[in-house]
């Protein structure tokens, strides 16, 4: 008897600094509850994309823009029997901060927006993934996106003070420590800040904790190594995880599916 026909697929755009672009189709269940440390911004091209987000069900239809805030849990499935086809761009909060100059991250309530300013600002970043972005074109598109998010969010900035420069130094330092144990105390010494103030500012400015940021950068490295053909165990150790099972656990928590299924959907 012939096996089931695999209809789900994911296409990835060529790598770009600070963001990832994908186009995908799911016939039914897409992925389990998970969370990214990036903005997940996209649009449904065909069908209905249903997902749980911030305590309720959301339904993305063509013509609206999805804006999932960093570190907010969500899942994904088809809202009808026709499946759903969508494009998504994952944008590092650090890129938004570099454009806005260090302020609380813009937040779109409910994760969906019908605002035409946001739809227009995402047009370039959400075009066909087979069409590469020119570097300057990408930078212009990110500028438009950051300011559209800021305008559409309509959330007043909190009055507390924060140290953007120290948080940015911590973020850069984390990139130098992917393959070893890192403590908040070490980050605080490097940035010359109190550790809890640094942790608070990091979360406010980049939308996630220092540990989560470190874990996600390790998973970025794992995915790059897997695409190159490295075995799961080797990729896990090279990226600083204790072992393959530790990496697989965190991979599933971050992306809603295990690495083996992720590779299969990429056609690897």
Predicted regions and their residues:
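Amphipathic alpha-helical segments enriched in hydrophobic/aromatic residues interleaved with Lys/Arg
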Residues: 102-159, 172
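N-terminal regulatory/effector-sensing and dimerization cores
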Residues: 3-106
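Short hydrophobic/aromatic patches on the structural cores and recognition surfaces of FHA
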Residues: 63-64, 198, 222, 247
């Amino acid at each position: 008897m012939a096996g089931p026909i695999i209809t789900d697929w994911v296409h990835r755009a060529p790598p770009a600094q600070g963001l990832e672009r994908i186009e995908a189709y799911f016939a039914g269940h897409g992925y389990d509850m998970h969370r990214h440390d990036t903005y997940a911004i996209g649009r449904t091209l065909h069908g209905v994309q249903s997902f749980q987000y911030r305590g309720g069900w959301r339904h993305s239809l063509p013509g609206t823009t999805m804006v999932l805030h960093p570190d907010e849990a969500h899942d994904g499935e088809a809202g009808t029997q026709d499946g759903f086809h969508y494009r998504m761009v994952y944008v590092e909060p650090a890129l938004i901060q570099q454009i806005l100059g260090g302020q609380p991250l813009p937040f779109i309530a409910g994760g969906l927006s019908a605002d035409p300013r946001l739809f227009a600002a995402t047009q370039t970043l959400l075009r066909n993934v087979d069409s590469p972005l020119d570097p300057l074109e990408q930078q212009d598109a990110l500028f438009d996106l950051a300011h559209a998010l800021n305008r559409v969010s309509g959330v007043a900035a909190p009055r507390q003070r924060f140290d953007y420069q120290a948080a940015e130094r911590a973020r850069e330092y984390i990139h130098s420590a992917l393959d070893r144990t890192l403590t908040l105390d070490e980050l605080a010494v490097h940035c010359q800040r109190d550790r809890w103030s640094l942790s608070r500012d990091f979360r406010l400015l980049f939308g996630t904790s220092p540990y989560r940021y470190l874990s996600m950068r390790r998973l970025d490295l794992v995915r790059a190594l897997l695409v190159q053909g490295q075995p799961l165990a080797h990729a896990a150790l090279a990226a600083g995880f204790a072992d393959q099972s530790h990496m697989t656990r965190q991979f599933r928590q971050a992306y809603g599916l295990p690495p083996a299924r992720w590779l299969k959907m990429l056609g690897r």
